[in-house]
Amino acid sequence: DEDNVLLT
């Protein structure tokens, strides 16, 4: 999902 995106 879009809410499970990891920001690096």
From Swiss-Prot:
Keywords: Antioxidant. GO terms for molecular function: antioxidant activity. Has antioxidant activity. Inhibits cyclooxygenase-2 and thromboxane A2 synthase. This is Verectin.
